[in-house]
Swiss-Prot record:
UniProt protein name: Fatty acid resistance protein FarB
Mitochondrion keyword on record: no
Protein induction: Expression is positively regulated by MtrR. MtrR acts by modulating the expression of the regulatory protein FarR, which directly controls the expression of the farAB operon.
Organism of this sequence: Neisseria gonorrhoeae
Domain of life: Bacteria
Cited PROSITE patterns: MFS
SUPFAM superfamilies named among the record's database cross-references: MFS general substrate transporter
Stored InterPro entries: EmrB-like, MFS, MFS_dom, MFS_trans_sf
Amino acid sequence: MDYPPLKGAALAWVTLSLGLAVFMEVLDTTIANVAVPVIAGNLGAATTQGTWVITSFSVANAVSVPLTGFLAKRIGEVKLFTAAAAGFVIASWLCGIAPNLQSLVVFRILQGFIAGPLIPLSQSLLMASYPPAKRMLALALWAMTVVVAPVLGPILGGWISGNWHWGWIFFINIPIGIISAWITWKHLKHRETATVRTPTDYVGLTLMMVGIGALQMMLDRGKELDWFASGEIITLGITALVCLSYFIVWELGEKYPIVDLSLFKDRNFTVGAIATSLGFMVYMGTLTLLPLVLQTNLGYTSAWAGLAAAPVGILPVFLSPLIGRFGNKIDMRLLVTASFLTFAFTFYWRTDFYADMDIGNVIWPQFWQGVGVAMFFLPLTTITLSHMKGGQIAAAGSLSNFLRVLMGGVGVSVVSTLWERREALHHTRFAEHITPYSATLHETAAHLSQQGISDGQTLGIINNTITQQGFIIGSNEIFLAGSILFIVLIPIVWLAKPPFHSGGGGH
């Protein structure tokens, strides 16, 4: 069913409400990360147990996102979005009052599952509310919230956990979610999408939930359990491989599939989804690595690490609306190419990190990386959805967002593991030069002994210095690899075929 575009104040309010929901959901994926030690300690649990606060949300969210297209057809996009925003409020309140870790994990599972439809439906409803000529501007405003929220998450999480009860990490969602749900329902309840009652593909649903759940669990817990040295990780990996392989075969032959894999027959959707997922994998991996380097090796507090990383969100706030307004005059592939080149340049800029560098070495690459971020989400989303019509937008949005989030998790897991293993390699190589016959060792020991430091303490200081250097060199190598990967990704984007327009129709 087609509706005329919204105008004036109604369009502004809907844009605000949909943007708030996206901001709330994306913020919640990162805000708890820095607060895990505080939450675990307050609830009488070990920090390693506290990581389930993050894992539970990501697993439930990963399972839920691909269901969006299926649920939207049965319930209606407006009802589903409003219910998800309202449900997120309730789940956030429950998380904030959780009396123990077990309850918090259960409520985070609920919160993650409910949050699944918010991002893909915000795309679909936003595009249906704007006239075709202005849909790129709508996507630009949407992309701006996706960029800023994960940057603010660690800063807010660290500040709240350091100054208030950790429950406020979740309570801040309550007014945002209420406003979003109320405004959306008020302005869009008469613009509900058509619903279709089709048989439920229970086999596909079960295979997808088990397969994706096992895969996300493997990614979240792999580093902690030393990957495939652990029987649990092997079991999760085999479960994910078998279930997802069978899921793909089953869905391709199913008349009423849970996930419409036929979307991959569209060239632009496939190219856009692949480029977005792989680019986001590299981006998220390094975005997570930077605060770790700053806190564990360069002596930054969590608050200062968050502030040092924050400049990446400055330029997108100003550039995204401009790209949305004038981007339809430029080939989307050129914008993505410029984005990937900017990422490659700023990543290479970081390959000379050293132990006593000042904060400017961190801030300036982050600041200019914002140019790449501004030209990343909007053009790639436009390419991905360029041939989608009406109800296909929600299904395509949910599938592409699922792949993006999944590959972002892969990036975080791979980068954190590589970082530790590169440190171990460099530590071993440096330690080989510390022998009883080493002139450097004797000079260092003599210098430290003059300051009243014992031989045992001297060896400890040297070991810590080697560890610090190993981690810094490891991070420099990862940034270099990220720079190369972004260059390699550029040809993929040029496989997309113009014309590019932001979705093919309304509802």
